[in-house]
A protein has these predicted regions:
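PAPS-dependent sulfotransferase catalytic domain
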Residues: 61-159, 163-181
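PAPS-dependent sulfotransferase catalytic core
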Residues: 1-54, 59
């Protein structure tokens, strides 16, 4: 079974894909076309995904919009479109966009300050100060990516799963963080 989890940042996709891979006894190929992958690595990863029988991978709209660097042909896009046609497609969304934005801001700022990684947990409370303009930039990015997700899913048969319906308190990251938005 090929399975694509199409979502946006901070929607529980890491846990969801890990669980799905265990449940279906398949390989978890994670963010196989991540924006930090080189073009050649994306081609290699897409080719691997399409030739692997039992695999799950997650993709965000930002990954899709960055498939092809300027000057390259549509090799990655053609393979990706073929993968979408051959895969079960699950869309993961959040009902609470404000919580999604806050989670994204916290993850970005914790990573930039080297206080914690994208998926790290910790017990001691951390206070983060975020300039209003930076917060708005991140909020606009998440909002735009959610809109892009809506455009993409119109073209494919899919199942929608909501983060709030599967992410119990035990599954959520333990991150006691106070976020202060400053002018």
């Amino acid at each position: 079974m090929k399975h694509i989890v199409l979502s946006n940042y901070r929607c529980g996709t890491t846990w969801y894909c890990e669980s799905l891979a265990k449940q279906e006894n398949c390989e978890n190929f994670d963010e196989f076309i991540h924006e930090q992958c080189s073009y050649n690595q994306k081609v290699k990863n897409l080719s691997y995904f399409i030739t692997t029988k039992n695999v799950v991978g997650k993709v965000f709209p930002y990954h899709i919009s960055n498939l092809e660097p300027a000057g390259h042909h549509s090799t990655c896009r053609k393979i990706f479109d073929e993968i979408l046609g051959l895969s079960k497609l699950t869309i993961i969304k959040r009902k609470d966009t404000d919580a999604q934005i806050k989670s994204y801001v916290v993850a970005k700022l914790l990573g930039r300050s080297n206080k914690a990684g994208w998926h790290d947990e910790f017990d001691e409370e951390v206070t983060i100060h975020c300039a209003k303009g930076v917060y708005e930039e991140y909020a606009n990015f998440i909002t735009d990516q959610n809109a892009q997700l809506e455009k993409i899913i119109k073209h494919y048969e899919h199942e929608i799963v909501y983060y709030e319906d599967f992410a119990s308190d035990e599954l959520r990251y333990n991150r006691p963080v106070k976020l202060h938005i400053t002018d």
